Design a protein with these regions (language model features):
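Eukaryote-skewed repeat-based solenoidal scaffolds used as protein-protein interaction platforms
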Residues: 90-94, 102-193
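Mature N-terminal, pre-catalytic/accessory segment of carbohydrate-active enzymes
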Residues: 1-72, 79-100, 116-141, 454-467, ...
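Hydrophobic targeting/anchoring helices
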Residues: 76, 99-100, 109-110, 162-381
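Helical hinge/lid and interdomain linker segments adjacent to catalytic or ligand-binding clefts
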Residues: 47, 58-60, 373-444, 520-531, ...
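A short, well-structured beta->alpha microelement
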Residues: 6-20, 34-55, 182-194, 380-420
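Carbohydrate-binding surface patches
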Residues: 336-373, 415-432, 455-504, 531-536
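The substrate-binding groove and active-site-proximal loops of carbohydrate-active enzymes
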Residues: 4, 8, 30-44, 63-79, ...
Length: 540
């Protein structure tokens, strides 16, 4: 399947995206849906059969999905015209990606935290929930994200892990039934891929950005579980971050695709210098692509692509996006990332959360056998996804990993040894090693040096793609050294610059293709210097 970039649809802006060279033959449309969007711009009206959007999608057979059913904003409970939805599904087939189910597991926890923090009286009735949230969050709508107030009152105050996991599965199945099994899960802090694929998800989409740690873990788990189920994955980029914490909004009038403002929702935008850096945006896009993502979407793309919605001059954000789209057009055939090793985690872990946590799982205290297995899993993952020294203030999401980026993560109940050379047993079950070829987390660097077609030393994040036996691609990222703030914009620190040594096997030659770097060859070795926040992309 050709790579797809999803672009937001708004009538007054969409044609400008095409004219700017952003929309290509294989690209798709994300239909933005939230409670504050004007009714004439919501799905039942704007996407109606015979309308401009409908005809464009039909004529171009382009992918489409609805961003979003719920999550990350006030819960709406919009009454979709499901006959219209089925029309799009039948028209597009696999190119209709369905409804984004946004951060649904973590949103339930944050909703619960709001009620606990606000000392919502027990029992949690609709009246008590509404009164507590209206008092503490005096916005135009009741501030729940994971479910309606009525649904929250029905499940009540969840204080036990197993009940939480059960409620989450029931919620997912309920939304699957409503949408005709067309949910597109988008997870960040809690990755529910095991639960989601078991219950009919066709693809998953981790939300990546500066505010969520361990991007490599997010993607390695999405890739591993997608591979296990024979499905696909993409990524959803969000531009939050910086100092003070905010999101960027380059649109000079402050407009955005969600029709929200700083006084109507608990968030903060800070113009072009807000949020995380364009350096991180560039690396997030490229990393997704070389990691095997088949599509990318973005949370705040429309309000950051053009300076205004009259002249449509590209912003720095828009230029990064256009450069990336041109990159994927020029380098269409880079093959798949080489991942000979799988980190196999317990089947009980139906959602993967913070690998740095201790004694807590999905915000609940744990002990006994589950804690033992979590400790083994997290210790192993921290070794496999460890990173080196950091500079600047954009660290923790994309990092300079200490070993090659060539490890998937997969649950033990769907692990297929035919897809990997070795497994790292993080299941907590010693019998696993009697069934499968295994190596320890400590042995993985040596294993990868044997099986990868090149060796990179020097402390920078790198990943290798194989297109054929005669063509490989190497991407090297320097994921540290960027300073980003509203006051000063962004800049790179000289002390974060690093030089790596690249040794190719079988007498191959390395051809530099893209990036900001300096490369020298000496005695059949390549020395590549990459400044802070920059990257190297080459073929051999």
């Amino acid at each position: 399947m050709a790579f797809t970039f999803f672009h937001a649809y708004m009538p007054k802006v969409f044609e400008a995206q095409i004219n700017a060279g952003l929309f290509r033959e294989n690209d798709g449309i994300r239909f933005c849906q939230s409670i504050d969007i004007d009714e004439n711009l919501k799905f039942n009206n704007l996407a109606k059969a015979g309308g401009k959007l409908y005809n464009f999608v039909k004529d171009n057979n382009c992918p489409l999905y609805i961003d979003r059913l719920q999550g990350g904003c006030f819960f709406e409970g919009y009454d979709y015209d499901m006959e219209l939805v089925r029309t799009y599904s039948e028209m597009l087939g696999k190119k209709f990606f369905g409804f984004q189910m946004h951060e649904w597991m973590s949103n339930f926890i944050s909703d619960t935290d709001k009620l606990v923090g606000g000392k919502c009286p027990e029992p949690w009735t609709e009246e008590n929930i509404t009164a507590t949230l209206k008092r503490d969050f005096p916005f135009p709508h009741i501030f729940t994200e994971a479910m309606s107030v009525k649904e929250f009152a029905e499940v009540g105050h969840i204080t036990e892990l197993n009940k939480y996991l059960g409620v989450m599965e029931v919620l997912f199945l309920k939304r699957q039934k409503y949408t005709g099994e067309m949910l597109l899960p988008c997870d960040s802090a809690i990755l529910g891929y095991s639960l989601e694929f078991k219950n009919g998800a066709k693809r998953v989409m981790p939300e990546i950005g500066q505010q969520t740690k361990h991007t490599s873990v997010q993607i390695a788990y999405a890739r591993g579980m997608s591979k296990a189920y024979g499905k696909s994955f993409g990524t959803y980029y969000e531009p939050w971050g910086g100092e003070p914490f905010s999101a960027c909004n380059y649109q000079k009038d402050g407009l955005n695709e969600w029709n929200i403002s700083n006084d109507s929702f608990p968030f903060k935008t800070a113009g072009g210098n807000g949020g995380s850096s364009r350096s991180l945006q560039k690396r997030m896009y490229l990393y997704s692509y070389v990691s095997g993502a088949e599509f990318i979407s973005e949370e705040w793309g429309l309000c950051n692509t053009f300076c205004d919605w009259n002249d449509f001059e590209l912003t720095p954000y828009g230029q990064v996006k256009k450069d990336f789209i041109n990159f994927t057009e020029k380098y269409k055939n880079i093959g798949k990332p080489i991942t000979p090793v799988a980190a196999v985690i317990p089947k009980e872990i139906i959602s993967l959360d913070n690998i740095d946590a201790d004694g807590i799982y999905c915000s609940f205290n744990v002990d006994g056998e589950l804690k033992r297995k979590l400790d083994i899993m997290r210790t192993g993952l921290r070794k496999l996804f460890a990173f080196g020294e950091t500079f600047g203030n954009e660290n923790g999401s994309l990092v300079n990993r200490l070993i090659p980026d060539a490890v998937d993560i997969v649950n033990e109940d769907v692990y297929d040894e035919n897809k990997y050379t070795y497994a790292v047993n993080l299941t907590g079950d010693e019998n696993f090693e009697k069934k499968y070829r295994c190596c320890s987390a400590e042995d993985v660097p040596d294993v990868l040096n044997r099986f990868l077609p090149c060796k990179v030393t020097g402390g920078l994040h790198h990943i290798v793609n194989k297109n054929s036996d005669d063509e490989y691609f190497l991407t090297i990222f320097n994921n540290t050294g960027i300073v980003r703030s509203v006051a000063d914009g962004e800049y790179g620190l000289k002390e974060a610059e690093k030089t790596v040594q690249v040794e190719l096997k079988d007498g191959r030659k390395l051809l530099a293709l893209y990036g900001n770097f300096n490369m020298e060859e000496n005695d059949s070795k390549y020395y590549i210097t990459v400044p802070a926040g920059e990257l190297f992309f080459g073929r051999f």
